[in-house]
C-alpha cells in the first residue's frame, strides 16, 4: 500500500510577492506537500484543505495602505502554526494588535540579524557570533514598512540596527514572523529555518520525494483510467516526455502518443524523439510528418503573433485528425504543471486559488468527449525534471535549454521557409555543440541562433558571396522575467562564427546579440 504523500500539507497564502512560488518550491524541497492560494480564501476552504501549518507570503503592497490585503481571521484561530514572511509578518502583527509604520530607512539587500531571545524557530541556527556574543544570521531584506510594535503576547526574537523586530514569536500559539525572506538563497540559513518550521514546529513528515510522487501518480492514474485508452501529444519537451513516461509505467500499451513533426524542430530532433520513446522505451507512437502542411500554412506570413497562431491551429487540426482515428481512446493526457494551474486560476481579487484546468491542447472536436488526465498538475518544473530522472529519462534532455512552442517558427524572423529552417538548424547545432565542448552550456540559462532574413556580402577564397546572416543569443537569468546577455569569451565566439560560415553553405555573417531583458525580450519574436 502506498503512503499518503498528501497527509501533511502546508498552505501558503499568496499576497503577491515575486518570491511566493519559490517559497512553495522550498517547502516541497524539504519533502512536504504544499499548495499556493490567494490570501482571500474562506474559512471553509482552509478547513477542507486541513493544513498542518500556514505560511503568509511577502507582497509588493503596503500593510498601512487602506484596503491592503489581510489574512482571513480563521488563520489565527485554526490551531495550527503560522509563519509570516515580510508582508506576512506585518499583516500578522496588525491583525493581532501590533502596529506597522513606514520606515525612513528601507532595507533592500543583505542584512545581519542579531538574535536577542531563544525561539524554537531559530534555536541552534546561526551564521556567526558577533563581538557582543550574540548569534547572527545573514539574511535578505526587501521592505519599506516595518513592525513598530509587536502584539502583546509576542516576544522580540531578533533585530537589526534599523529594524527592531526582525523576528517575532508567540511560542505558545506557534505564531512566528520574519521580516526577511528565508526562501531566497541569499538568506544563508533560510532553508534550515523553513525546515524547522515545517518539520519541527508543524510536525510534518518528509513524505514528498521523487520516488513517492511517482508511486502515488501511478496508483492515481490506474484508478482514474481503469482499463481505458489514453492519447497524448508528445513534443519531446520536458512536460510531455515525463507525462508519457508516467502513463507508460501506469498503463503500458494503452497509451498512444502522437508526435507531430512540424518541420520547425532542432537538428535531428524528430529522429531522437522517435528513437528514445519508441525504440528505447517501447512507447506506442504515431509519427505525423507534417512539415509541408505547416510551411504551406506559413507561406507569406511574417508577423510573429500570426505565425504563432497558425502553428498552434495547424497542430490542433493534426492532433484532432489523429485522435479521431483512435476510436478506443477515452482520455486526453496533458503535461499541465502547477505553475500553469496557478496562472489559469482566478479569484474575485484576480489572484489565484480557484483551480481550473489549463489546456495545453485546445480545440478538440466536441463529439470526442474525452476525459482529461493531468498527472503533473501538482508539480513545479524542477520536480518534473527530478521525477523524469527517476523514470530513466536522460539528464541532457531534461535539463536542456527552453525551446519555444512554435519552434523555429519564431527563430526565423519574418516569413518561414524550408531553406531558412535548414540553415538555422545546422548553425544552431554548431553553437550548442561548441557550448558543450567549452563547458559553457550549463553556465548560461538559454542559448540559441536566430535567422535574419537579410543578405550580407562575404569573401570565400577569391570569390565574393552574398548570403544570409544569423545571430547568436545567450542569456543568464534566474527567472526568465529579466535577463543579462552572457559575456561569452571572444575566442569562443570567433570559433563558433568560423565554423558556421565555413560549414553552413548559405550563411556569410554571424553576429552576437548583446541586448538585455528589458528592454529586449529573450526570443527575437
UniProtKB/Swiss-Prot annotation:
This chain is encoded by the gene named guaA
Q: Which residues bind ATP?
A: 235-241
Pathway assignment:
Purine metabolism; GMP biosynthesis; GMP from XMP (L-Gln route): step 1/1
Catalysis: reaction(s)? XMP + L-glutamine + ATP + H2O = GMP + L-glutamate + AMP + diphosphate + 2 H(+)
Taxonomy, superkingdom: Bacteria
GO BP annotations of the record are:
GMP biosynthetic process
Q: What does this protein do?
A: Catalyzes the synthesis of GMP from XMP.
Q: Which Pfam families match?
A: GATase, GMP_synt_C, NAD_synthase
Describe the protein's quaternary organization and the partners it interacts with: Homodimer.
Give the protein name, as stated in the record: GMP synthase [glutamine-hydrolyzing]
At the top of the EC hierarchy, this enzyme's class is ligase
Name its species: Yersinia pestis
Q: What is its EC number?
A: 6.3.5.2
Q: Name one GO molecular function term.
A: ATP binding
Q: Which UniProt keywords apply?
A: ATP-binding, Glutamine amidotransferase, GMP biosynthesis, Ligase, Nucleotide-binding, Purine biosynthesis
Q: Which residues form the Glutamine amidotransferase type-1 domain?
A: 9-207
InterPro entries for the chain: Class_I_gatase-like, GATASE, GMP_synth_C, GMP_synth_GATase, GMP_synthase, GMPS_ATP_PPase_dom, NAD/GMP_synthase, Rossmann-like_a/b/a_fold
Q: Which PANTHER family match?
A: GMP SYNTHASE [GLUTAMINE-HYDROLYZING], GMP SYNTHASE-RELATED
Q: Does the keyword Transit peptide apply?
A: no
Q: What's a single GO CC term here? A: cytosol
Active-site residues, Swiss-Prot/TrEMBL: 86, 181, 183
Q: What are the GMPS ATP-PPase domain coordinates in residue numbering?
A: 208-400
* Record has Nucleotide-binding as a keyword: yes
Amino acid at each position: 500500500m502506498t503512503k499518503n504523500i498528501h497527509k501533511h500539507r502546508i498552505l501558503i497564502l499568496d499576497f503577491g510577492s515575486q518570491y511566493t512560488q519559490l517559497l512553495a518550491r522550498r517547502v516541497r524541497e524539504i519533502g512536504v506537500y504544499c499548495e499556493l492560494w490567494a490570501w482571500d480564501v474562506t474559512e471553509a476552504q482552509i478547513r477542507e484543505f486541513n493544513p498542518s501549518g500556514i505560511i503568509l507570503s511577502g507582497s509588493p503592497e503596503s500593510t498601512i495602505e487602506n484596503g491592503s490585503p489581510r489574512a482571513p481571521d480563521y488563520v489565527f484561530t485554526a490551531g495550527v502554526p503560522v509563519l509570516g514572511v515580510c508582508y506576512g509578518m506585518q499583516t500578522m502583527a496588525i491583525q493581532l494588535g501590533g502596529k506597522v509604520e513606514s520606515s525612513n530607512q528601507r532595507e533592500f539587500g543583505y542584512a545581519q540579524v542579531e538574535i536577542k531571545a531563544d525561539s524554537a524557530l531559530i534555536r541552534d541556527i546561526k551564521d556567526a557570533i558577533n563581538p557582543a556574543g550574540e548569534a547572527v544570521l545573514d539574511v535578505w531584506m526587501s521592505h519599506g514598512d516595518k513592525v513598530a510594535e509587536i502584539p502583546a503576547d509576542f516576544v522580540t526574537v531578533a533585530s537589526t540596527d534599523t529594524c527592531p523586530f526582525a523576528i517575532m514569536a508567540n511560542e505558545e500559539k506557534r505564531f512566528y514572523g520574519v521580516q526577511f525572506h528565508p526562501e531566497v538563497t541569499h538568506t544563508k540559513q533560510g532553508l534550515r529555518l523553513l525546515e524547522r518550521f515545517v518539520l519541527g514546529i508543524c510536525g510534518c513528515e518528509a513524505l514528498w520525494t521523487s520516488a513517492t510522487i511517482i508511486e502515488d501518480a501511478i496508483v492515481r492514474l490506474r484508478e482514474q483510467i481503469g482499463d481505458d485508452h489514453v492519447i497524448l501529444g508528445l513534443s519531446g519537451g520536458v512536460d510531455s516526455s515525463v507525462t508519457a513516461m508516467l502513463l507508460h509505467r501506469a498503463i503500458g500499451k494503452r497509451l498512444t502518443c502522437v508526435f507531430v513533426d512540424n518541420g520547425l524542430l532542432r537538428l535531428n530532433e524528430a529522429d531522437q524523439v522517435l528513437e528514445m520513446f519508441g525504440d528505447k522505451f517501447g512507447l506506442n507512437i504515431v509519427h505525423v510528418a507534417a512539415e509541408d502542411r505547416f510551411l504551406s500554412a506559413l507561406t507569406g506570413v511574417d508577423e510573429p503573433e500570426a505565425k504563432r497562431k497558425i502553428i498552434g491551429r495547424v497542430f490542433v487540426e493534426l492532433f484532432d485528425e489523429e485522435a479521431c482515428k483512435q476510436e478506443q481512446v477515452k482520455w486526453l493526457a496533458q503535461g499541465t504543471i502547477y505553475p500553469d494551474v496557478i496562472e489559469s486560476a482566478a479569484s474575485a481579487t484576480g489572484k489565484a486559488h480557484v483551480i481550473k484546468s489549463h489546456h495545453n491542447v485546445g480545440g478538440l472536436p466536441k463529439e470526442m468527449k474525452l476525459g482529461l488526465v493531468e498527472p503533473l498538475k501538482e508539480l513545479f518544473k524542477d520536480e518534473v525534471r527530478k521525477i523524469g530522472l527517476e523514470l530513466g529519462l536522460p539528464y541532457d534532455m531534461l535539463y536542456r535549454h527552453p525551446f519555444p512552442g512554435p519552434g523555429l517558427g519564431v527563430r526565423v524572423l519574418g516569413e518561414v521557409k524550408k531553406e531558412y529552417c535548414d540553415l538555422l538548424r545546422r548553425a544552431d547545432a554548431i553553437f550548442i555543440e561548441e557550448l558543450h565542448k567549452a563547458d559553457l552550456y550549463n553556465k548560461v540559462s538559454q542559448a540559441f541562433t536566430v535567422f535574419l532574413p537579410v543578405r550580407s556580402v562575404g569573401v570565400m577564397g577569391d570569390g565574393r558571396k552574398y548570403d544570409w546572416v544569423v545571430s547568436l543569443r545567450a542569456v543568464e537569468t534566474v527567472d526568465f522575467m529579466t535577463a543579462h546577455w552572457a559575456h561569452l569569451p571572444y575566442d569562443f565566439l570567433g570559433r563558433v562564427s568560423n565554423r558556421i560560415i565555413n560549414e553552413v553553405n548559405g550563411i556569410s555573417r554571424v553576429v552576437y546579440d548583446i541586448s538585455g531583458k528589458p528592454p529586449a525580450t529573450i526570443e527575437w519574436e
